[in-house]
Amino acid sequence: MKKTVIFTLLCVLLAMPAMAQPGYRYSRPRIQTVGHHGNEYVAWHRYYFGLRLGMNASHVSSDSPVLDGNGVKTGLNLGFAAGTQLTYRAPIFLESGLYYSQKGGKSGSGQDKFTYDLNYLEVPLLIKYKHFVGNQTSIQPYAGGYLAIGTDGSIKNYGSRTAFSSFDDGYFNRFDGGLKLGCGVGFNMLYVDASYDIGLSNIGQDDFNDTHNGCFTINIGVNF
C-alpha cells in the first residue's frame, strides 16, 4: 500500500510541469497610479502549482504511558500544492494540495521500546501572504488547517518482538485533523518552507485515549 501511494504521487508530480498553464510570473508586483489618487495593486501570480519534497519530525502525545514519550520519528513528506490569489488588492493566496505524510513516534527504550508508524494522505487548506523582498524573493507566512486519512502503518513492540497494524487492529483512528502554521521563502521558481502541525483530533482508540499528532516539517520544491 505504501509503495503504491508513493508511486502514484510521484507520477502525478512528474506530470504536473507538463500540465501547468502559464500564470506564474517571477517579478515584484507592478504598481499602477490612477489619476492623482493613491496607488492600486495590479494582479500578479494569479495562481500557481508546486511540487514538494521534505522530511517530517513527528511525535505523539497521549495520556497512555505506552505512547506518550519524547521519541521523535522521522519520515517522508511528498506531494503537490496549488494556490490562487484571493484579491487583486493584496498578495493574499488560498493554497491546498495533496501530500503523503509519514508520521508517528517512539516511546520507551530497550525491552520497553515501542515505535508506531502512522502514514496519511493529507489535504491542507491555508491562507498565505507573500511579502516581496527584492525582485524575485518573497517571504510567505501562512496559517490554516489540515485533514488526513490514514493509509497504512505499524506498531512495533521490541520487547515481545511483535508488530501490529496501526489502523486495522483498532489502535488508532484513521482520521486526523488540526492546525498548520508555517512560513516559506520563494526565490524565482524555487521554494522552501518549515511548518508545524498541531493535531486536534483524538487519533487513539481503546487504551490509547486522548492521543494527538504533532509534526514539524521542512519542505523544498518548485512552483510553476
Predicted features along the sequence, with ranges:
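Outer-membrane beta-barrel "beta-signal"
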Residues: Y24, M189, H212-F224
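Short glycine/proline- and aromatic-enriched beta-strand/turn motifs that initiate or cap beta-hairpins
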Residues: Q21-T74
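Sec-dependent N-terminal signal peptides
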Residues: T4-L14
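Outer-membrane beta-barrel translocator domains and adjoining extracellular loop/strand segments
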Residues: S61-L67, K106-D112, G153-R161, G204-N209
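Membrane-embedded beta-strands of outer-membrane beta-barrel proteins
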Residues: L51, L78-F80, L98, V123-I127, ...
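Outer-membrane beta-barrel transmembrane domain signature
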Residues: L86-I92, K113-I203, F224
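Sec/Tat signal peptide C-region and signal peptidase I cleavage site
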Residues: M16-A20
